[in-house]
Amino acid sequence: MKEFIKYLEKNILKEEDIGFKEAMKLSKCEEVGDIKQLCHSADNIRDFFCGVEVDLCTIMNAKSGRCTEDCKFCAQSGHYKTNVENYELVSKEEALKLARENENEGVNRFSLVTSGKGIRGKDFEKVLDIYKELNKENRIDLCASLGILEYEDLIRLKQCGVTMYHHNLETSREYYKEICTTHSYDERIDTINAVKKAGLQVCSGGIIGLGESFEDRVRLAFQLKELEAKSIPINVLNPVKGTPLESAPKLSQNEILKTIAIFRFVNSKAFIRLAGGRNLIDGFGENCFYAGANATITGNYLTTSGNKICDDKKMINKLKLKIRKNVHKEKKMF
């Protein structure tokens, strides 16, 4: 298996794409030595295509709870009884304050995240107003995660300074119906295609530990490659009491590392981003940066606590990596 892994690494470094069957063979790694080689090769691929820079992003839970959708993993779904805090859209002042604090800490990206299938009406207009002000007052790169949107809405976001749009596929097409029934996989794909058409970068990934097979993860990795995802957040399920997945079994550390490494093999040039559930990974995912990861959400997540920005910066320095410098383009002033 080690020689096969090295063979694939060599081909990828020559910009030859890995095939689905080859990726599936990598998923069969079980011996400790094979997993170490898989991670080492993924790290080499990361270094070759992406260098030593780590992309840091932060998110703000800008509207929480009462979601109409039935995603089985989600604390914010109105279908389940969880202890999540419910509140309407945050104020412009709150968003500006957090964005400024994060920018001062050296974070590259800042995103508003809202609950619900897709933000609409007056709330969408308010979000646009917030982004206009963020773009005017800050140098941090702006991202958005506002659910299923139309092309025209995405164009308006871009005009307000947003450069990347986040919309997870969550899992493979084949497994999706097991975790959500209130909207289709194709609606998510359509949103991502609209993101691309609008000229925004795509941030899309998924959650592992939903009960999916490794084949589902590999299928997701290839789907994201097809969609040209620039940033691929990988979440580890953090089971929430009151949701259908509250008793989901915990993933092993090796399974998490294997998943991240294979995503790097398939998506050699993307930001492979540690996201929710980092607290379930040893050392808040430190070893993942030796397995192909080169980005992370830092600070708190939507409904759970994350790692402090200062601690992530220390970890990145310890690993002899560098925080990516902000490359925000000349902004249009409003």
Curated annotation (Swiss-Prot):
Keyword Iron found: yes
Name of the top EC class for this enzyme: transferase
Cofactor field: [4Fe-4S] cluster; [2Fe-2S] cluster
Keyword S-adenosyl-L-methionine among record annotations: yes
Annotated protein name in UniProt: Biotin synthase
Matching HAMAP family: BioB
GO BP term (any one): biotin biosynthetic process
Summary of subunit composition and partner proteins: Homodimer.
Matches recorded under SUPFAM superfamilies: Radical SAM enzymes
Residues annotated for [2Fe-2S] cluster binding in this entry: S111, C143, C203, R273
Domain (Radical SAM core) ranges: 49-278
Family to which the UniProt record says this protein belongs: Belongs to the radical SAM superfamily. Biotin synthase family.
Catalytic reactions on record: (4R,5S)-dethiobiotin + (sulfur carrier)-SH + 2 reduced [2Fe-2S]-[ferredoxin] + 2 S-adenosyl-L-methionine = (sulfur carrier)-H + biotin + 2 5'-deoxyadenosine + 2 L-methionine + 2 oxidized [2Fe-2S]-[ferredoxin]
Recorded GO MF terms: 2 iron, 2 sulfur cluster binding; 4 iron, 4 sulfur cluster binding; biotin synthase activity; iron ion binding
Pfam families in UniProt: BATS (PF06968), Radical_SAM (PF04055)
EC annotation from Swiss-Prot or TrEMBL: 2.8.1.6
Pathway: Cofactor biosynthesis; biotin biosynthesis; biotin from 7,8-diaminononanoate: step 2/2
Keywords: 2Fe-2S, 4Fe-4S, Biotin biosynthesis, Iron, Iron-sulfur, Metal-binding, S-adenosyl-L-methionine, Transferase
InterPro entries given in the database record: Aldolase_TIM, BATS_dom, Biotin_synth/BioAB, Biotin_synthase, Elp3/MiaA/NifB-like_rSAM, rSAM
Binding site for [4Fe-4S] cluster: C67, C71, C74
The protein's role, per its UniProt record: Catalyzes the conversion of dethiobiotin (DTB) to biotin by the insertion of a sulfur atom into dethiobiotin via a radical-based mechanism.
Cofactor note: Binds 1 [4Fe-4S] cluster. The cluster is coordinated with 3 cysteines and an exchangeable S-adenosyl-L-methionine. Binds 1 [2Fe-2S] cluster. The cluster is coordinated with 3 cysteines and 1 arginine.
